Amino acid sequence: MKLWKRASGALKDRKTLFTIGFSRKTSFRNPDLDSAIIHATSHDDSSVDYHNAHRVYKWIRSSPANLKPLVHALSSRVNRTRSWIVALKALMLVHGVLCCKVTSLQEIRRLPFDLSDFSDGHSRPSKTWGFNAFIRAYFSFLDQYSFFLSDQIRRRHKKPQLDSVNQELERIEKLQSLLHMLLQIRPMADNMKKTLILEAMDCVVIEIFDIYGRICSAIAKLLIKIHPAAGKAEAVIALKIVKKATSQGEDLALYFEFCKEFGVSNAHDIPKFVTIPEEDIKAIEKVINGVEEEEVKKKEDEVEEEKSIILVERPELQTIITDKWEIFEDDFCFTCKDIKETDQHRKFNMDPSPLPLIVIDEPVYFTHTLPDLITF
């Protein structure tokens, strides 16, 4: 059965190479590059064709014009395959291309194919589920890494000045996210101790060394910039990054132990992972607490200022009902005279002086015209 699969895979590769021999060179196709890609991503699971892989890398380094033929050939190769061997070799080839870090890679952004839901179509799922999971995890990392690398190259050429603290924090967070995705790439099934898987794990371990080293270097530079004058938001993010770096250091130690037991050659010598000194963590916490204390003190000062303000309230108008009023002579004469004249026909002989201020039982009628006190 295995011999039949190998023979079938070799026949497919030869057929593809035969077809490429009749194709013409265009802006999207390069027969020589296509041939190197087919050899580097063959159906042979016993070895990796490093010679043709390095030919592809030389094509990419030689001219940016070779990027389009590479993308076209790789996407065409991967989209048509149902073999985990071809898919994994294609991912390893892409990984090597990204490590070239040439300027033209900024045009790729995301990978030109999708293996997030890959499933091998040549064997039963019970035998290939581990390979499928491995390829999906590897693709997820490379897809994000390609986007991150493209963004970094673009920023470097757009503005060469130094990044701000916020930009450095953002970059470290992305690197930590990439490292987390790398740690998910591991063989989980018992039948995965294959030459091709070990080669892929070697590539993963090398990438872990590179990314973790960049994280440690960036954190060392960042700790110098986080001082009492820095903002609270920056200090909070920095503390989160430092704690995550400590946690990832522990995860890396376990991951390398697993790789060593599995037989990954690059993991035989487990490195000493850098630990963040406790003094640096406390220094960041002091910055955060110092900013919080300043904010609390500022609020307390504002409250004290509000308490020290004396509010001057205007007296409100009040209505007073009383029978003790000052009566001026003019008002008194006017009242007495008019009331007497008005009440002559009613035959009331009363002295108006004892009348109450507000008449309730008997209204007073005035026959003369009242003066207009509103019109000016």
UniProtKB/Swiss-Prot annotation:
Superkingdom of origin: Eukaryota
Native organism: Arabidopsis thaliana
SUPFAM superfamilies per record: ENTH/VHS domain, GAT-like domain
One GO BP: clathrin-dependent endocytosis
Pfam (any one): ANTH
Location of the ENTH domain: 25-156
Coiled-coil parts of chain: none
Protein name (record): Putative clathrin assembly protein At1g25240
